[in-house]
Amino acid sequence: LLDEIMSYVEDHLAGHITLDDTARQFHVSASTVSQLFRKRMGVSYYRFVTQRRLIAAKTLIKEGTALDTVAESVGFSDYSGFYRAFKQEYGISPTRFKTL
């Protein structure tokens, strides 16, 4: 089940995916999904989603995609939220990462 959920998340990164929506998709409770991630992945569902979005963002940045387009393409509702998450995760800004 966890592998299927992880694949679902990967396929829907650009959209607004929530724990409840994901649980409904797999006909389980939100707490079941949450427990699976905590026990098997060592992170929360939302942390996993954010990490996957940021990994996808790094790829797009290195491909030369405009940063505001990157943020939208990986499911962030605005650039400032993307910027904060990226900087918190990697310790550098997306702009700085682009120059590396």
List where the protein language model places each region.
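Short helix-coil-helix linker/hinge
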Residues: 1-3
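Terminal helix-turn-helix DNA-binding modules in bacterial transcription factors
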Residues: 7, 11, 16-20, 39-77, ...
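Short coil turns linking two alpha-helices in DNA-binding domains
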Residues: 29-30, 77-78
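Short hydrophobic/aromatic patch on the recognition helix
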Residues: 33, 37, 81-82, 86
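…primarily DNA-binding HTH/wHTH and HhH modules…
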Residues: 84-100
